[in-house]
Regions:
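Glycine-rich flexible loops
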Residues: 1-371
Length: 371
């Protein structure tokens, strides 16, 4: 049995710690990497490698098989043949020719971010606090107020090779920087050791949390909306059980879906506030989230005291409108090479006074969409 490289052991331990706390990143969101020297099995000489979380894996449960191992010399040589942002997808395919040995995971679109940054360890995460800054209209200004020159703003760019070049340039130009906030996306941190990188990631996340708590309003979702607090737990669950078959049928028009229900305090509080219709309609801020949630939820615009048949009729009407709007949204943004639309049904349905219904192909996917 081949002994695991020390860099891999450290990387897995760091990934598990970061991925265990949902404040740090969403399920299967973000990626981590480590660079180190290994032995070329053909020549017996030294070879510089990077181990990075592969496509689709989850930090909290990452294994060695979920890592992609790439030769740094080949990866960095791609900078000389990079054809530009119009052909980003070709670069992801090129990563396969930088792999070291057999097995492991497929490299993700974020691979360049890790390989091009001149640091032994890199974390890229999607924490709520970081996304709040990244997606704010004045995110660049807020980032500077929060961190000074230790965390640098990087304007929105589609994930890919050019974003990796952007972040590498930011690090080189800002020697005091420990990381950056990626506009509309998340955060990236780096360090000379695994411990330093993790410490810096957590510092960015917790500092942003404290900054937002200090600057935020006491009631960010507005005051309570009269008549929207709902019944107690027993009445709420009874209403949820009555609505669930109808809602799942609506969410399964394109293909059968498994449902998950959440009536936690944070969900109920949001749905009891005056701002919830406006904020829900704005949609999801982070692109990594709406891969699972779609761009916005369907929200029942009736109080929990409305008769059941009235609520069901309104849900059917809202669902028809949602499908029409989602198809139009897809048509507006799809390109010639875009994948086919993956259905127009909502993945998230919010019912004031009752809770959140989330949907997916299986139990785990439905639960994660809700998370």
């Amino acid at each position: 049995m081949t002994e695991q490289h020390a860099c891999v052991s450290e990387l897995l331990a760091r990934s598990h710690r970061l991925g265990a706390d949902p404040r740090n990143t969403n399920y299967a969101g973000g990626n981590t990497s480590a660079k180190g020297t290994s032995t070329d099995p053909v020549t017996g000489g030294d070879v510089e490698l990077m181990w990075v979380k592969g496509s689709g894996g989850d930090l909290g449960t990452l294994t060695a098989d979920g890592l992609a191992a790439l030769r740094l010399d080949r990866l960095r040589a791609l900078e000389g043949v990079y054809p530009g942002v119009e052909r980003e997808d070709e670069m992801v395919a090129a990563f396969d020719y930088c792999l070291h040995g057999r097995g492991g995971a497929a490299p993700s679109i974020d691979t360049a971010m890790h390989g091009l940054v001149d640091a032994a360890h890199v974390d890229h995460l999607h924490p709520d606090s970081g996304i709040a800054l990244a997606c704010a209209a004045d995110g660049e200004k807020l980032t500077a107020e929060c961190f000074g020159d230790t965390v640098v703003w990087v304007p929105w760019r589609r994930p890919g090779f050019q974003l990796g070049l952007d972040i590498a340039a930011v690090k080189e130009a800002n020697p005091r920087a420990i990381g950056c906030v990626l506009g509309g996306h998340g955060i990236t941190a780096w360090g000379d050791t695994a411990q330093e990188c993790e410490r810096r990631s957590l510092h960015i996340i917790r500092t942003a949390e404290a900054f937002l708590a200090e600057r935020g309003r006491a009631e960010p979702f507005g005051p309570l909306l009269a008549g929207y607090t709902g019944a107690g737990p027993a009445g709420r669950r009874e209403r949820a059980a009555a609505l669930a078959p109808f809602i799942r049928a609506l969410a399964s028009q394109d293909r059968p879906q498994v449902g998950h229900f959440d009536d936690s305090d944070v969900v109920l509080d949001f749905l009891s506030r005056t701002e919830h219709p406006r904020l829900a309609a704005l949609g999801t801020s982070c692109p990594d989230h709406f891969l699972r949630t779609k761009v916005r939820p369907l929200v029942l615009d009736l109080p929990p005291t409305a008769p059941l048949d009235e609520a069901v009729a309104r849900l059917r009407q809202l669902h028809a409108e949602y499908r029409e709007e989602y198809a139009a949204y897809y048509a507006r943004h799809a390109g010639p090479d875009s994948p086919a639309m993956r259905g127009a049904d909502p993945a998230i349905v919010l019912v004031p006074g009752v809770g959140m219904f989330s949907f997916g192909k299986d139990k785990q996917t439905a639960r994660v969409a809700g998370e």
